[in-house]
Swiss-Prot record:
Record's function text: Catalyzes 2 different reactions between oxygen and the acireductone 1,2-dihydroxy-3-keto-5-methylthiopentene (DHK-MTPene) depending upon the metal bound in the active site. Fe-containing acireductone dioxygenase (Fe-ARD) produces formate and 2-keto-4-methylthiobutyrate (KMTB), the alpha-ketoacid precursor of methionine in the methionine recycle pathway. Ni-containing acireductone dioxygenase (Ni-ARD) produces methylthiopropionate, carbon monoxide and formate, and does not lie on the methionine recycle pathway.
Underlying gene: mtnD
SUPFAM superfamilies: RmlC-like cupins
Protein name, UniProt field: Acireductone dioxygenase
Pathway: Amino-acid biosynthesis; L-methionine biosynthesis via salvage pathway; L-methionine from S-methyl-5-thio-alpha-D-ribose 1-phosphate: step 5/6
Organism (species): Microcystis aeruginosa
EC number, as in UniProt: 1.13.11.54, 1.13.11.53
Record-stated family: Belongs to the acireductone dioxygenase (ARD) family.
Length: 183
């Protein structure tokens, strides 16, 4: 389950407590189970072919259909990151600085884990480690950053209303939060 660590040393591990803190940012965190056994088996692989990615996406389309109906999402893809990817650190570097997006950043972590950092309205900071079967929606214009945990492994479904709004717009905010994971 998700873990929220605040700059003041407070740690939350219960979804209700985490959701209460994230509500200050209008960030949504949900638990979406993966019930298809074949999908769970595929997700054990370190990397996936394009065909395997499509099988996984199709098996999870119930969630995509829900997002299409409720919020107008138009597209989704599956990103698979692991240590054997060439230039992984370079790829991730553009998200490890404080930034915003013109569109919501919506992720459904289906394997591995990632860390979203946030700047709260009072200027304090925190980091949320999200794990398999957790869905997060970071609203447009929310100041945040992202990095992988020390395992450097994640499989995440990305949902888009448009890909045009998903370019990072960097801010000058210095990340003060002492990350507990190696980047």
């Amino acid at each position: 389950m998700a873990i929220l660590r605040l700059e003041n040393g407070t740690t939350y591990t219960q979804l209700a407590d985490i959701s209460l803190e994230l509500a200050k940012l209008n960030v949504t965190l949900n638990y979406w189970p993966i019930e298809n056994e074949a999908t769970r088996q595929l997700l054990k692989e370190a990397s996936l072919t394009d065909e395997e990615k499509e099988i996984v996406l199709t098996s999870l389309d119930g969630y995509f259909e829900q997002l299409k109906q409720e919020a107008g999402y138009q597209a989704r893809d599956l990103i698979v990151l692991h240590p054997d990817i060439a230039n992984l650190d370079t790829l991730l570097a553009k998200f490890e600085r404080c930034h915003t997006h013109a569109d919501d950043e919506v992720r459904y972590i289906i394997d591995g884990e990632g860390v979203f950092g946030f700047v709260f309205p009072d200027g304090s900071q925190g980091e949320l480690t999200i794990q398999p079967q957790e869905y997060i929606n970071v609203p447009a214009h929310s100041e945040h950053w992202f990095h992988l945990t020390a395992s450097k492994r994640v499989k995440a479904v990305r949902y888009f209303t448009t890909t045009a709004g998903w370019v990072p717009e960097y801010t000058e905010t210095v990340i003060r939060f002492p990350s507990l994971t190696a980047v």
